[in-house]
């Protein structure tokens, strides 16, 4: 059930108040809502934006997006154009894609072959206005802890897939603030040693084996307690 008609006061880029008795000032711009329904802006917390979908976000009521990995040149150009008003689109919070080098490497962001290069790219992201990094599946597990430590030193959020041959528990202990995708958590409890999550197994193993997982088992409960 909808409430009574209200007046929404916007000051600069923020909603200042929602009241039934707000009187507009002499210099206020008044937009007649004509008895319609107003929703707060929605946020897409896991996106990979592109030129064509930015206006569609606004059309769907999404006013903020969190981009979790993209082509860095394209993304920076798109955000610059959006913030200047040259392109319509939501506000974007950026996390930089960081991948290890392997035959399975994803091709966006930075693909690194050693730890010094990984740390250098973390610093690049911090210097270019990114709010976090997203670690991907081919990252060497032993690099995660120093990479996360450097990211945190620079005030960056750390998220990502769980690298192949690493458990979700170790990823959290080594510095992850967030694991992207629920399958990346569940794989730790249904895989056998040596199985490679850089393959379609990261999808099929969860679908085929989850029904046999005991959620009360010690590994699952230990992980829940860790969180």
Q: How should these model regions be labeled?
A:
Residues 33-39, 49, 53-170, 174-227:
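Divalent-metal coordination cores built from histidine and acidic residues
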Residues 2-39:
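Histidine-rich, glycine-flanked metal-binding segment
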């Amino acid at each position: 059930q909808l409430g009574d008609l209200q007046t929404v006061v916007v000051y600069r880029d923020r909603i200042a108040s929602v009241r039934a008795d707000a009187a507009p000032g002499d210099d206020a711009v008044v937009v007649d809502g004509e008895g319609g329904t107003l929703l707060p802006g929605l946020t897409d917390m896991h996106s990979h934006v592109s030129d064509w979908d930015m206006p569609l976000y606004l059309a769907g009521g999404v006013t903020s997006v969190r981009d979790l990995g993209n082509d860095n040149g394209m993304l920076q150009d798109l955000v610059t154009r959006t913030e200047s008003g040259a392109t319509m689109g939501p506000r974007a919070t950026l996390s930089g894609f960081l991948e290890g080098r392997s035959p399975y490497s994803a091709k966006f962001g930075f693909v690194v072959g050693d730890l010094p290069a990984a740390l250098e790219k973390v610093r690049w992201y911090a210097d270019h206005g990114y709010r976090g990094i997203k670690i991907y599946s081919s990252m060497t597990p032993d690099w995660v802890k120093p990479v996360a430590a450097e990211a945190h030193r620079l005030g960056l959020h750390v998220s990502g897939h769980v690298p192949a041959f690493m458990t979700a528990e170790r990823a959290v202990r080594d510095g992850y603030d967030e694991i992207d995708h629920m399958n990346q958590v569940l794989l730790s409890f249904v895989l056998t040693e040596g199985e490679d999550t850089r393959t379609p197994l990261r999808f099929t193993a969860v679908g085929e084996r989850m029904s046999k997982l005991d959620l009360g088992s010690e590994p699952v409960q230990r992980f829940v307690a860790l969180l």
